[in-house]
Amino acid sequence: GETCGFCLMLSSFGFNYKTKEAASHSHPKCDCRVVPSFGKGSKVKGYDPDGMYDRFNECLDTLGGRNGLWAEWDAMPDAEREAYIKAHGNKAGKAFDKYVNKRMVEEIELRDPKWYASGEHSGIEFTDSAVKGEKLKRWKKDPGERITAEKLNALCYKAEFWEDESHLTAPNSDGKTTISRADLSTGIEIKTIYGAGSENTFKSHIKSIPGKNGVKLTVVDVSENEKVTDEQAIKWISKYIARYHISEVRMLGHDGKLLRIKK
């Protein structure tokens, strides 16, 4: 699977498709090529299931392992969890396993698919030449966003920039309205805070997140900020994600690692 998180997850476990019938399996938004195995010792050039399984576990570790996902499941509002269980045949164990799969697919789809499949990194990418031109022009004046994207890709996240504004028709004097979108095509919103060390700066960045369309994860990068410590940044981020009802932010700290900060 080159584009589908579900198929990338399945590929981590070797040849799952043992029959032609199983190979016909599909799911929403899937455009992946299915390679069935009908015998022992099957091989596909470039396919590294052992390496992919290691990277699967790396993604699982990011989410806190199964224990961390159980904590999420347990913290889910009772009505939401019961509805999830009901949707899976009133079997709590099956429902939790489906929840684990769902969260893993969400995490894998944030990652660089080239890295997930092969261990190699794609680098910064752009959906088209217009986006590339606009970004390169902007980065000449302020390279912070580019630096953060490079660091994210080095940490195995997909760093593909797209048009981060949608222009829709609207019944106003301009005849249109502009809706801001996440910075990256995966739904990652980048907040690079290098030159400021005030609480208000963190507040304004966090406050803007709910107003953007399609944000799946926000990364706050303070790795090169000499005016604020990781500890202080964590306190401010925690304060404002609670205030603005944001479930999670990942902070890129001075040690170059991503830290999950949950509401």
Regions found by a protein language model. Give the residues of each.
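Metal-dependent catalytic core segments for phosphate chemistry
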Residues: 181
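Residues in well-ordered beta-strands of folded domains
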Residues: 8, 33-35, 160, 189-191, ...
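Catalytic micro-motifs at enzyme active sites that drive phosphoryl/nucleotidyl and oxygen chemistry
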Residues: 15-23, 163-168, 174
